[in-house]
Amino acid sequence: MAKLKIVKMGDEILRKVCRPVEKITPRTVMLLDDMIETMRDADGCGLAAPQVGILRRIAVVEVEPGQVIELINPKIIAFAGQQEEQEGCLSIPNRWGVTRRPKHVTVRAMNRNGETFEVSGSDLLARALCHEIDHLDGKLFVDCMIKEVE
């Protein structure tokens, strides 16, 4: 595994829409492993492929230590409620803001074995899933920020 360089705001790759993963290869699996290591090293709870310079629909989320959710071609299939909470981003260091996100989401994705699964979450997990999927569509949390936090 290798720690990857995290792309910072201002790099145009963060504003591009990622392409779906057509086939899961050993390189895809290695990218997932490297993204997990990079996310943990940066003390984050999520990381999307464009944040490490890769325009593919891949993300990892870990809001509970040791419980990594690997997402390949994720799609939000259901959402409910609303929450306004503080968010940050590894690509936008030292900047925080309150965003409005769904309170609960269900996401369908594939895992590293190519198996389709669904994950549902509320509160922090819902925010993290939405945040990472936004990255795959070229969106940053500052785009939906309703209030900056000093």
Annotate the PLM regions.
Residues 1-150:
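Positively charged
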